[in-house]
Design a protein with these regions (language model features):
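N-terminal hydrophobic/helix-forming segments and targeting peptides
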Residues: 1-302
Length: 302
């Protein structure tokens, strides 16, 4: 990053095809440190939603300050609530911060986090943007789009090939946390990006509040849903578990009921909520809930 005056001076003195040698006058200090902020709100269940944002470039209002402002507002809101899934908030330097945080907490993250959001560039007044997780099947992918649709807001939906922020690290091979990036104007695609025009005139309290409400509602939607996860490998032997009397599915033969339960288990990977499983296996929601309750009772799902 250079000042506008420095850039102007270079453009006046040199040709477009000029080459420069860059000297980085620094040393690696093994005793150095990297600081980040972390705040955890415990839920009823062990599973967690990760909320990450970054703070590293100085003086940029939308790119650097809007994410932490909305994130701190989320902390203030949810710490007063009773929640089902834990909320883990992280404020880090972009890229190197995410890599460092993952390095230090990988086992905990992969064990507990089942979805989440990377929040950036949420202070301007343009349309919303979200980048889906790598496999496009994360609860955060579904919830953010459901909220934007229900609010009838204009938005752009992008796949993971359009990544560019910390979702690169959180969704990388060996990590795969199912993180969705949420923005207004997408980073690196708005004229003010990484310029002095990304200032307090470019963002507004109104836009920050609107963004806060969208992401808050998305988190609350995830909190309100049940995401079954199969606790065994391969199909279970159901006969010995005496499921027939406990599943109330009228008008279906024993064979059909067995197939429904096995179908339910196939989609119980922690990413599909009960309503989506119900739609997928073509079963009434009330019947799907009965299947879930039974499988939970005999510890085939969590």
């Amino acid at each position: 990053c250079v000042s506008h005056e420095f850039k102007k001076n270079v453009l006046e003195k040199y040709e477009d095809n000029s080459f420069f040698d860059m000297k980085i006058d620094t040393k690696f200090n093994h005793k150095g440190n990297l600081r980040y902020g972390e705040y955890f709100i415990k839920g009823k269940k062990d599973k967690e939603i990760l909320i990450s944002t970054y703070l590293c470039h100085p003086s940029m209002a939308n790119n650097e300050l809007s994410g932490p402002i909305v994130t701190m507002s989320l902390i203030d809101y949810f710490k007063k609530k009773k929640i089902n899934y834990g909320l883990r908030f992280v404020i880090i330097p972009e890229t190197i911060g995410a890599i460092s945080y993952i390095h230090k907490n990988l086992k905990k993250l992969t064990r507990n986090v089942f979805c989440g959001f990377n929040i950036t560039c949420v202070g301007d007044s343009r349309n919303y943007t979200f980048i889906k997780s790598k496999y496009e099947n994360s609860p955060s992918d579904y919830s953010i789009e459901d909220v934007l649709k229900n609010k009838k807001l204009k938005y752009t939906k992008l796949n993971f090939l359009k990544r560019g922020s910390d979702e690169r690290q959180y969704n990388s091979v060996g990590v795969n946390l199912g993180i969705t990036t949420f923005s207004r104007s997408k980073f690196d695609e708005f004229p003010e990006y990484h310029t002095s025009l990304d200032n307090f005139d470019f963002v507004s309290i109104k836009s920050l509040t609107q963004s806060f409400n969208v992401i808050k509602d998305s988190i609350e939607l995830i909190q309100s849903r049940i995401y079954p996860k199969t606790q065994i490998v391969c199909e279970p032997f159901l006969t010995k578990r005496n499921f027939y009397p406990e599943i109330n599915i009228k008008g279906r033969k024993f064979k059909d009921k067995t197939k429904l339960i096995l179908d339910f288990l196939q989609y119980s990977d922690g990413n599909f909520d009960l309503k989506k499983i119900s739609k997928k296996i073509k079963c009434k929601y009330s019947e799907t809930k009965d299947i879930y309750k039974y499988l939970l009772k005999i510890k085939l799902v969590s």
